Amino acid sequence: MKLTKVLFFMNMLSGMGYSIFSPLFPALAIKKRIAETIIGVIISVFDLANTIITAFAPLLFIKFTRIKLLYISTFSEATCTILYGLIGNYFNSYYSLIIFMIFFRIIHGISNGIIATLVYSLTISLAKESEQKSALGNLEIGWCIGLALGPIIASIFYKIGGYLLPFLFLGSILYISVYLSSNVAQEKTESNNLEQGNPPILKFLSHLDILVILLAFFFGMISESFFYPSLTNHLEKYFNLSLSVASLFFMILAIAYIITLLNIDKATERLGLYGSIFIGLLIAAFGVLMVYPYPPFPKSIIFVIIGLTMIGGGSAPIFIPGLVNLSKNIKKIDPNIDEFSSNDISSAINNITIAIGDFCGPIIGGYFSTHFGFKSSCLIVSTFIFIYSILYFIYFRSHIFVKEKNIHFDFDSKSEERELMNYPGLYKENNIEIDINLDGIGKRKRSFNPKLKYNEEDDCHYLKLSEN
């Protein structure tokens, strides 16, 4: 099997394992009188473990081979999924249930962090630069198909056999990932750098451009994860939906994400990488507000669907352009870094930030829902995301868009295309208008007002000159 297909299916299965927990466990925990704040902690420790292991992933890749880590992680992820069902079904002690769930959520988080870092790093490394956005988009589609299938499996098998059956079924399916790992082991890559080590992550985190993008990842993930402890209960309580039906609402995020991913190239072409992130943040902020809308909008299941669709659709323009931006910034910071190491680092930083957002989201959502109610928690989270989207826009407006500059070129005709290269830091964004004075020998000085179009694949600007 082609390696890109193997990575796609591994990511899809990992998404299924991740998404089945949030619809089912909170409902079980509430029946066993576990507070929403504690439920949020149990959900979030997965991402805390994911964050820590991802931070050390480049060091682990030096000490252990990537392939061995992949074998262990895929086996562990499948086993933890089965154990969630067994523990939830047979452990009636309040403290035993919490302790064992937290322990295996940590193990699952560690496994998922290693799988995600390797899968994304290999995908972006094996793709040509012009195809990286599409390759990452396809990989994300695999993850989102998994996120959508998880709640469907939860809904169908919960109706058939209660809480335990969905976890037993999905855990058995996830053992397919162990087989897929053997395909990765057999595949030879052109660079033969699968077992090469990486430079430390920390030196890249001191750069403000990278930190600003990572904060966008963080708030994007908060928008998706803050209602994990509360949404199922909210839908059951206020709209009288059964657990099997309420579980399906988690799939709306994934479907909206997939649809947006299919059009991500068009979006980034029109808005640019930085503009796409800004628009994604705005859409996510208003989507969170719509999940429990304030007047004049009525409280309606239609608005819940619209809100979840906006959150899922807004996430894609944040994560995919952001990851491409990360990889480019890392190469600029360290021009000597090799392709695999650069993508290991960008993948690790991306996964760390998303895991931190996924860790904080359920805790924030559980706390606010417990103390202020679900309605207020939506308003608070939406406000924070909106404020950051404005700060993000101000920062990149001042750093990316370039003021007028004079550049001298010779020209042969009144209207022609010219390629501007080797001007580091001069042009950074789409459709910047500048005045260019062209001084030709034996020709009179003339002023032109060109339109610049930045070609991200070639990392240069193409210029159409027309005489004023």
Residue spans for each PLM region:
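C-terminal ends and interior cores of transmembrane alpha-helices
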Residues: 76-94, 283-298
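Intracellular juxtamembrane helix-capping segments at the cytosolic ends
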Residues: 114-127, 317-335
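Helix-to-loop junctions at the C-terminal end of transmembrane segments
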Residues: 54-65, 260-272
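Extracytoplasmic gate region of multi-pass secondary transporters
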Residues: 21-23, 212-250
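Conserved MFS/SLC helix-loop-helix module at the cytosolic interface between two early adjacent transmembrane helices
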Residues: 52-89
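Helix-loop-helix hairpin linking two adjacent transmembrane segments in secondary transporters
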Residues: 138-182
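Cytoplasmic helix-loop-helix junction between adjacent transmembrane helices
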Residues: 104-142
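Residue-level signature of mid-helix packing/kink "hotspots" within the transmembrane helices
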Residues: 47-55, 147-148, 254-258, 262, ...
